[in-house]
């Protein structure tokens, strides 16, 4: 299993219960993926993940951490050493806005920012702590990760936190509860505001926005924002956090092993296969965010469990074929 996030852990759980030895690899030093290194501690106590590790290890699951597949271990070796492989590496590639100023000092991507805060709480050595104490902060984006950044900055002691989103509140992709929590804690929302530039010479000085108005709906039912001419406005800020979401980051070795992708890099499952979550390489299974894009933890867990059931059936059928061949 590649990836010790929700999908990988769920897969390991079900495989072990079916008598299959599960080895879980992850590039981080602790299991959990975004459960550990993305979701803030005020939303998920980290000792819950540690307890889950103890339970899984007690069941027989083996964790190989601080190990990146394709870097520390070649995927070729994986294919030689294991009877089946599950990919649950999630989506960690940050989406950018594509506007001027994103590389200025004081601009941070959401996940490294959240990660640094969690590692500071863990007292991780050599952690580059990103602290918003006393700062005016603008968070760009309207999903749950944006809300995590808002609330984390406030807990660090930020002077002011703005959250800017190019649509209105009704069209936000994030949880209504998360927005409500952010409001109650003091976040000021800037609705119908689209960033077009992060301004400053070397360091962030503010964000230039244009107002938007909503028109016809897109294929997902959300109204499409269009720019209001002459509505440019600069809001001053000491720091900017970009939280536009994540997308898959396909590995270099995918093509070699016939791991097929859709137009945005998500792994495609063989829908005609009788084994759930099997890719177009019969030995490789995949689930979670790698298949459907950034989604809920419960969805990743569901797909990890489903993939384990597919792997169990695949290995069972292969064992029967091997026995039949041996008896010929």
Where are these regions (language model features)?
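A conserved FAD-binding loop/helix module that cradles the flavin
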Residues: 149, 290-315
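Conserved Rossmann-like nucleotide-cofactor binding loop
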Residues: 7, 29-30, 92, 145, ...
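Feature captures the FAD/FMN-dependent oxidoreductase FAD-binding
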Residues: 2, 7, 50-99, 197-204, ...
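Long hydrophobic segments that form regular secondary structure
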Residues: 131-167, 233-239, 245-247, 265, ...
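Rossmann-like dinucleotide-binding cores of NAD(P)H-dependent redox enzymes
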Residues: 24, 28-59, 150-197, 319-328
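Glycine-rich dinucleotide-binding loop and its adjacent helix/turn
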Residues: 54-71, 94-156, 263-275
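FAD-site-proximal beta/loop scaffold in flavoenzymes
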Residues: 105-134, 217-294
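N-terminal Rossmann-like FAD-binding beta1-loop-alpha1 element of flavoenzymes
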Residues: 1-24, 145-154
């Amino acid at each position: 299993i590649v990836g010790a996030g929700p999908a990988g852990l769920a897969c390991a759980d079900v495989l072990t219960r079916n008598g299959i030895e599960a080895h879980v690899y992850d590039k981080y030093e602790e299991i959990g993926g975004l459960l550990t290194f993305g979701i803030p501690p005020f939303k998920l106590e980290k000792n819950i993940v540690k307890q889950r590790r103890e339970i899984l290890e007690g069941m027989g699951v083996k964790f190989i951490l601080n190990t990146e597949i394709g870097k520390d271990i070649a995927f070729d070796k994986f294919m030689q050493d294991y009877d089946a492989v599950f990919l649950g590496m999630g989506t960690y590639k940050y989406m950018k806005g594509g506007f001027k100023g994103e590389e200025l000092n004081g601009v941070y991507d959401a996940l490294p920012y959240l990660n640094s805060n969690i590692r500071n709480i863990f007292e991780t050595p050599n952690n580059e702590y990103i602290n918003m104490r006393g700062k005016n902060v603008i968070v760009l984006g309207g999903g749950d990760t944006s809300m995590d950044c808002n609330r984390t900055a406030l807990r660090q002691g930020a002077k002011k936190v703005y959250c800017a989103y190019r649509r209105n509140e009704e069209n936000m992709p994030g949880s209504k509860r998360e927005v409500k929590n952010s409001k109650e804690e003091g976040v000021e929302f800037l609705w119908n505001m689209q960033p077009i530039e992060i301004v400053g010479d070397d360091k962030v000085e503010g964000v230039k926005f244009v107002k938007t108005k909503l028109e016809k709906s897109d294929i997902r039912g959300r109204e499409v924002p269009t720019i209001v001419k002459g509505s440019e406005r600069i809001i001053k800020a000491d720091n900017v956090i970009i939280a536009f979401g994540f997308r898959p980051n396909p590995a270099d070795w995918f093509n070699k092993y016939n791991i097929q992708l859709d137009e945005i890099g998500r792994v495609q499952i063989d829908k005609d296969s009788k084994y759930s979550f099997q890719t177009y390489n019969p030995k490789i299974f995949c689930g979670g965010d790698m298949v459907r894009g950034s989604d809920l933890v419960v969805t990743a867990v569901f797909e990890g469990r489903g993939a384990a059931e597919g792997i169990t059936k695949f290995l069972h059928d292969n064992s029967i074929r091997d026995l039949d061949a041996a008896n010929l």
